[in-house]
Amino acid sequence: MDSYRKYAAIILVTLSVFLHILHSLPEGEFTTEECPECKLKENKYFSKLGTPIYQCTGCCFSRAYPTPFRSQKTMLVPKNVTSESSCCVAKAYTKATVMGNVKVENHTECHCSTCYYHKF
């Protein structure tokens, strides 16, 4: 019975040390900061010319999962992994003219939706 108390004490000490270390880390230490949320960001290149031009930047979700066998049967080139994703795109925009005659889209609202143009 005495040996169980020793094991319980060791486990409690280990757990309390682990929790202390976990709480002492800065907030968001384990989150990826490479890809911010989907939002409007000023385009510095086109905004130099007077009128601020905004575009949607950031990340949405993507996931991959094994392709079901019945779906693989219908594929011309069967693939073992299926992936889905959504991209940060403009929900609303206005047309703007910069540099005299170049027409660009000035995004006014962003959301996550179907990816039309993939970056490699």
Curated annotation (Swiss-Prot):
Highest taxon listed in the record's lineage: Eukaryota
Gene Ontology CC terms, in alphabetical order: extracellular space; follicle-stimulating hormone complex
Organism: Saimiri boliviensis boliviensis
PANTHER family: GLYCOPROTEIN HORMONE ALPHA CHAIN, GLYCOPROTEIN HORMONES ALPHA CHAIN
MF terms (GO), sorted A to Z: follicle-stimulating hormone activity
Record flagged with keyword Signal: yes
Assigned keywords, A-Z: Disulfide bond, Glycoprotein, Hormone, Secreted, Signal
Disulfide bonds: C35-C59, C38-C88, C56-C110, C60-C112, C87-C115
Annotated glycosylation sites: N80, N106
Subcellular location, principal: secreted
Protein name in UniProt: Glycoprotein hormones alpha chain
Classification of source organism: Eukaryota, Metazoa, Chordata, Craniata, Vertebrata
Protein family: Belongs to the glycoprotein hormones subunit alpha family.
Signal sequence residues: 1-24
GO BP: any one term: thyroid hormone generation
Keyword Repeat: no
Role: Shared alpha chain of the active heterodimeric glycoprotein hormones thyrotropin/thyroid stimulating hormone/TSH, lutropin/luteinizing hormone/LH, follitropin/follicle stimulating hormone/FSH and choriogonadotropin/CG. These hormones bind specific receptors on target cells that in turn activate downstream signaling pathways.
Quaternary state and interactors: Heterodimer. The active hormones thyrotropin, lutropin, follitropin and choriogonadotropin are heterodimers composed of CGA, a common alpha chain described here and a unique beta chain which confers their biological specificity to the hormones: TSHB for thyrotropin, LHB for lutropin, FSHB for follitropin and choriogonadotropin subunit beta/CGB for choriogonadotropin.
Subcellular localization: Secreted
